[in-house]
UniProtKB/Swiss-Prot annotation:
Domain of life: Bacteria
InterPro entries according to UniProt: HemC, Porphobilin_deaminase_cofac_BS, Porphobilin_deaminase_N, Porphobilinogen_deaminase_C, Porphobilinogen_deaminase_C_sf
Reactions catalysed, as given in the entry: 4 porphobilinogen + H2O = hydroxymethylbilane + 4 NH4(+)
UniProt keyword annotation of Phosphoprotein present: no
Protein name: Porphobilinogen deaminase
Record EC number: 2.5.1.61
Cofactor binding, note field: Binds 1 dipyrromethane group covalently.
Top-level enzyme category: transferase
Subunit structure: Monomer.
């Protein structure tokens, strides 16, 4: 019998490779006879580091090359951070599985200060996220927010060199890279609402590839999937990519899904919020309803200013 092989397309950053190896390990644990190979790739988002992502078209910057590998048969699946995955997929591709979520909160990282509120007036804070920027400015208008690009290691190096007083990163990435000690404090979701899908890993494949979909099925996490579907439906209704000042975070209590969302002006002068609850099977409907509530409050005007700015 021929050895069964599964090829995983992945970015080359340490965090992306961790995620790909996480999927590889889970699959080989379930299927000992399966050979899983990584196909590391460089994406546009990895190459263009001197420009804010929103300026080069935020959608799909970290996934397009991986999707091309799926379409031309160079890989069978692609592993992504869910917050980087656009809502629209190329014809023939789709999201097969969302794995169990890591801590979705943002992390406050600093060598000198313990919390966001400990920072002195005018402190320099690094983040590449418009979502984080608007919420930071809302709480601390005095802070000097500066762009910060690159992988986790690069960002930490810039902090350690003294370029910033603090930086904001996803807690999930630091935990996965075995760097939890770099987290000075977790920023609670009431202060910084996470991005849709933050902390979750998704697996994309060809929608007609039933062999692969069957292999992946045991990796799906029901709770994470419901939460992320609600968050992404909200984001999609707002036509938000991964580089917009939109936050969305859902939690599941029993069979009830609770979704909170926001859209903010970049200077923090205005933040529009909405929240609601529904049965878990109505996750995507809830996401759309929350988006409609944000739009009714003027979210579209804020987003238009961001896109046209």
């Amino acid at each position: 019998m021929q050895q069964e092989i599964l090829k995983i397309a992945t970015r080359q950053s340490p965090l992306a490779l961790w995620q790909a190896n996480f999927v590889k390990d889970r699959l080989t644990e379930i299927y000992p006879d399966l050979t899983v190979e990584l196909v590391p790739m460089v994406t546009k988002g990895d190459v263009i580091l001197d420009t804010p992502l929103a300026k080069i078209g935020g959608k799909g910057l970290f996934v397009k090359e991986l999707e091309n590998a799926l379409l031309n048969g160079d890989a069978d699946i692609a592993v992504h951070s869910m917050k980087d995955v656009p809502m629209e997929f190329p014809a023939g591709l789709g999201l097969s599985v969302i794995c169990k979520r890591e801590d979705p909160r943002d992390a406050f990282v600093s060598n000198r200060y313990r919390t966001l509120d400990d920072l002195p007036p005018g402190a320099i804070v690094g983040t590449s996220s418009l979502r984080r920027q608007c919420q930071l400015k809302k709480r601390r208008p005095d802070l000097n927010i500066r762009s910060l690009r690159g992988n986790v290691g690069t960002r930490l190096s810039k902090l350690d060199q003294g370029d910033y007083d603090a930086i904001i990163l996803a807690s999930a990435g630091l935990i996965r890279l075995a760097l939890p000690e770099r987290i000075a404090s977790f920023i609670e979701t009431e202060i910084s609402l996470p991005a849709a899908g933050q902390g979750a890993v998704g697996i994309e494949c060809r929608i007609n590839d039933q062999r692969v979909q069957k292999l992946l099925a045991p990796l799906a996490d029901t709770e994470t999937t419901a939460c992320v579907l609600a968050e992404r439906a909200m984001n999609n209704r707002l036509q938000g990519g991964c580089q917009v000042p939109i936050g969305g975070y859902a939690v599941l209590n029993g069979n009830e899904l609770h979704l909170r969302a926001l859209v903010g002006a970049l200077d923090g002068s205005k933040i529009i919020r909405a929240e609601g609850k529904s049965a878990v099977e109505n996750a995507e409907v809830l996401g759309i309803q929350i988006a409609e509530s944000l739009l009714a409050q003027g979210a579209d005007k804020i987003l238009a200013e961001v896109y046209n700015g």
